[in-house]
């Protein structure tokens, strides 16, 4: 992750298997104010040990799903990021 520009602190919420692997329901991370979803995902996977579910994760920024990993995300201080693995059940 390239953090040459401005950096902000965002709140990260983990759900289901991502919560188990990260060993926490929530955390904070410093991220650039502009980053691709793919770069962000790689950073979170590395920082929180999510490699085993990386290809199945869904990210949501301020309660809006990120549909395309090539999308650029613009963060402001205190934004919220959710890390959501697919849920199963019946």
UniProtKB/Swiss-Prot annotation:
One of its GO terms (biological process) is Mo-molybdopterin cofactor biosynthetic process. It is found in: Cytoplasm. InterPro entries: Beta-grasp_dom_sf (IPR012675), MOCS2A (IPR044672), MOCS2A_euk (IPR028887), Mopterin_synth/thiamin_S_b (IPR016155), ThiS/MoaD-like (IPR003749). The modification Glycyl adenylate is found at residue 90. The modification 1-thioglycine is found at residue 90. C-terminal thiocarboxylation occurs in 2 steps, it is first acyl-adenylated (-COAMP) via the hesA/moeB/thiF part of MOCS3, then thiocarboxylated (-COSH) via the rhodanese domain of MOCS3. CDD domains: Ubl_MoaD. Keywords: Cytoplasm, Molybdenum cofactor biosynthesis, Nucleotide-binding, Phosphoprotein. It holds the Pfam family ThiS. SUPFAM superfamilies: MoaD/ThiS (SSF54285). Acts as a sulfur carrier required for molybdopterin biosynthesis. Component of the molybdopterin synthase complex that catalyzes the conversion of precursor Z into molybdopterin by mediating the incorporation of 2 sulfur atoms into precursor Z to generate a dithiolene group. In the complex, serves as sulfur donor by being thiocarboxylated (-COSH) at its C-terminus by MOCS3. After interaction with Mocs2B, the sulfur is then transferred to precursor Z to form molybdopterin. This protein is produced by a bicistronic gene which also produces the large subunit (Mocs2B). Heterotetramer; composed of 2 small (Mocs2A) and 2 large (Mocs2B) subunits. This is Molybdopterin synthase sulfur carrier subunit. It comes from Drosophila sechellia. The lineage of its organism: Eukaryota, Metazoa, Ecdysozoa, Arthropoda, Hexapoda.
């Amino acid at each position: 992750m390239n953090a040459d520009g401005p950096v902000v602190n965002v709140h990260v919420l983990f759900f289901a298997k991502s919560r188990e692997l990260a060993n926490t329901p929530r955390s904070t991370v410093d991220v650039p104010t502009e980053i691709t979803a793919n770069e962000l995902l790689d950073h979170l996977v590395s920082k929180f040990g999510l490699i085993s579910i990386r290809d199945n994760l869904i990210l949501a920024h301020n309660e809006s799903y990120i549909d395309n990993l090539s999308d650029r995300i613009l963060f402001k201080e205190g934004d919220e990021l959710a890390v959501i693995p697919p849920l199963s059940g019946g």
